[in-house]
Curated annotation (Swiss-Prot):
Organism lineage string: Archaea, Methanobacteriati, Methanobacteriota, Methanomada group, Methanobacteria
Domain of life from the UniProt record: Archaea
Gene name for this UniProt entry: ef1b
GO molecular function: translation elongation factor activity
Protein name: Elongation factor 1-beta
Biological source species: Methanobrevibacter smithii (strain ATCC 35061 / DSM 861 / OCM 144 / PS)
The protein's role, per its UniProt record: Promotes the exchange of GDP for GTP in EF-1-alpha/GDP, thus allowing the regeneration of EF-1-alpha/GTP that could then be used to form the ternary complex EF-1-alpha/GTP/AAtRNA.
Amino acid sequence: MGEVVATLKIMPESPDVDLEALKAAIQAAMPAEAEFHKIEEEPIAFGLVALNLIFIIEDGEGGTESTEEAMAKLADVASVEITDTRRLM
């Protein structure tokens, strides 16, 4: 099997959320089977900034589910959504 790079958009609950603390929580919550790559900030509107988590996983059953579930459980997270997946060559 190969590897897949995935992008997970993480929406904070409000513009008042401490993004640096949330970034640290995201890195700490990464499942063992997922390899952290980077986090990019994406301005949305009215001061709200989404975090795009880019990570690498093995291409297999379950895929991104464990990472999605781990991020959805974090405090100050309103929603999570996979926005991109690509197979690495």
